[in-house]
Amino acid sequence: MSNPMRPVRSILLAIFTGCAGLIGYALYLQLVENLLPCPLCVVQRMAYWLIGLTALAGFFHTPETTGRRIYAGLMAVFAFTGGLVALRQAWLVRYPEAFECGISPEEAFLNALPLARWWPVMFEANGDCADVTWKFASLTLPDWSAIFFMILAALSIYVLLVRENQRE
């Protein structure tokens, strides 16, 4: 007997694993490569956390159609939000003159959140959003983040729309 939720559960586990890997790499860049996160980076980290934890909850809960769609819808909203933030940061990297110097209201707000006090290494913003110190294949970190958010959004929409009686 085939479990109709198995493909969906595999995707949810892959989404969680991908988000955990991206967060782990962000911490590596911060702690080993000394690349401080800016306010927009911290918001993207929060989005990756929200997507990953929602996927993990969906994986363990294995809900029926309505619950699966709620989990997938939340993941899609978090992915689109994170993607928009990543695109905004990519724009700031390309047009740094549009960025104001000094402490931004976003930085002050994020650093005042309980999350930043509870886990400052993960959620405290100290970097400059327009600073480019890392590139891979001619793409900056915000570019790659936007790509990963698009992939996560596409997977979330697939989970949202897939029929549960689909067989492997």
Swiss-Prot record:
<comment type="function">
    <text>Required for disulfide bond formation in some periplasmic proteins. Acts by oxidizing the DsbA protein.</text>
</comment>
<feature type="topological domain" description="Cytoplasmic">
    <location>
        <begin position="163"/>
        <end position="168"/>
    </location>
</feature>
<keyword id="KW-0813">Transport</keyword>
<dbReference type="InterPro" id="IPR003752">
    <property type="entry name" value="DiS_bond_form_DsbB/BdbC"/>
</dbReference>
<keyword id="KW-0472">Membrane</keyword>
<feature type="transmembrane region" description="Helical">
    <location>
        <begin position="144"/>
        <end position="162"/>
    </location>
</feature>
<keyword id="KW-1003">Cell membrane</keyword>
<keyword id="KW-0676">Redox-active center</keyword>
<feature type="transmembrane region" description="Helical">
    <location>
        <begin position="12"/>
        <end position="28"/>
    </location>
</feature>
<dbReference type="GO" id="GO:0006457">
    <property type="term" value="P:protein folding"/>
</dbReference>
<dbReference type="GO" id="GO:0009055">
    <property type="term" value="F:electron transfer activity"/>
</dbReference>
<keyword id="KW-0143">Chaperone</keyword>
<comment type="similarity">
    <text>Belongs to the DsbB family.</text>
</comment>
<keyword id="KW-0997">Cell inner membrane</keyword>
<feature type="disulfide bond" description="Redox-active">
    <location>
        <begin position="101"/>
        <end position="129"/>
    </location>
</feature>
<feature type="transmembrane region" description="Helical">
    <location>
        <begin position="70"/>
        <end position="87"/>
    </location>
</feature>
<keyword id="KW-0560">Oxidoreductase</keyword>
<dbReference type="InterPro" id="IPR022920">
    <property type="entry name" value="Disulphide_bond_form_DsbB"/>
</dbReference>
<dbReference type="Pfam" id="PF02600">
    <property type="entry name" value="DsbB"/>
</dbReference>
<feature type="topological domain" description="Cytoplasmic">
    <location>
        <begin position="64"/>
        <end position="69"/>
    </location>
</feature>
<feature type="topological domain" description="Periplasmic">
    <location>
        <begin position="88"/>
        <end position="143"/>
    </location>
</feature>
<dbReference type="GO" id="GO:0005886">
    <property type="term" value="C:plasma membrane"/>
</dbReference>
<dbReference type="InterPro" id="IPR050183">
    <property type="entry name" value="DsbB"/>
</dbReference>
<feature type="transmembrane region" description="Helical">
    <location>
        <begin position="47"/>
        <end position="63"/>
    </location>
</feature>
<feature type="topological domain" description="Periplasmic">
    <location>
        <begin position="29"/>
        <end position="46"/>
    </location>
</feature>
<keyword id="KW-0249">Electron transport</keyword>
<dbReference type="GO" id="GO:0015035">
    <property type="term" value="F:protein-disulfide reductase activity"/>
</dbReference>
<keyword id="KW-1015">Disulfide bond</keyword>
<feature type="topological domain" description="Cytoplasmic">
    <location>
        <begin position="1"/>
        <end position="11"/>
    </location>
</feature>
<protein>
    <recommendedName>
        <fullName>Disulfide bond formation protein B</fullName>
    </recommendedName>
</protein>
<dbReference type="InterPro" id="IPR023380">
    <property type="entry name" value="DsbB-like_sf"/>
</dbReference>
<keyword id="KW-0812">Transmembrane</keyword>
<feature type="disulfide bond" description="Redox-active">
    <location>
        <begin position="38"/>
        <end position="41"/>
    </location>
</feature>
<keyword id="KW-1133">Transmembrane helix</keyword>
